[in-house]
Amino acid sequence: MAVRPIALDGEGPVLEALERARIDVLHCTPSHQFPTGITVPVSRRRSLLEWAQSGVAAPEDGAAAREIRGRSVKASSARSRYLIEDDFDCEFRMAGRPVPPLAALDGAGRVIYANTFSKTLGGAFRIGYMVLPEALAERFRDRLGFYACTVGALEQLTLARFMESGDYERHVNRQRTRYRRRLSALIDVLAASSAGDHLHFANAGAGLHFLMEVRGVEGDERDSATFEERVARRAAIRGVRLAPLGRYRFTGCEAGAPGRSSNETVGCRCEAREVEGARRVCDEVRSGCSEGRGRRRPAFVMGFSSLEEETIPEVAGIVSEAVVAELG
């Protein structure tokens, strides 16, 4: 199994990049891409579904092409294509109307939907789930049905009761209100701080993290990563841990080194018998990012779910002072 990075733009995976990569499976997080926070709009979601469906039927000839949302792309093979939709914090949309998941738009059985209760109930609960297309579900039962479930029956029954009663939905609604308040407070304090004129907050409308970009010091990947690390070190000395965007690259690439950063998602090309390969590359799929060759602003992945509201002014002040100190 080969794992290949796929370019992202402001709306998600780039269709032409999918065709060039000649992949069979795209792993994506359309509700809230990590680490950029991009939410894929419905129009791009439909285009991704059309890409997945276009791999099912054999092309009419070697030069065959298909129109996907007005773009001409080659139908590169007759192999089945799938989208793995990792919807890891879809419950926490902070602004705007909810966007339907790929699985809800899929009418051809091309989406493998996966989610977890780690964000809503806590990581210690360790319950996740996957919804397979019917054809794949049958193959899963035939080939892997001997695997025992690692989640105890008591935990499953308790969660089922919690959901059936409506208490789970009420719990998530309360969490969403609480997190929205924390998000608003953090952004307001940072914007009003001494570094506020240099900060831009991107993709804060969904999920439990957003990007804080620093204006005025845009450089190449190495320059931006170096600036990020210096700011992070200053904040760490005072007890605040920042997550520089430059750290999100394939294993083995150091911050600022030639390699991969944050503007891509991941696709795989699979041979028919390479089921085991999925396990070997799982970590790479979750950490996959992009070619780090362009220019970008320094940025930080800002999580806020664990912040208490009374600590936000202090934390924001430390972050602001670290940025100002490096800006000089």
Describe the role of every protein-language-model region.
Residues M1-G328:
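PLP-dependent class I/II
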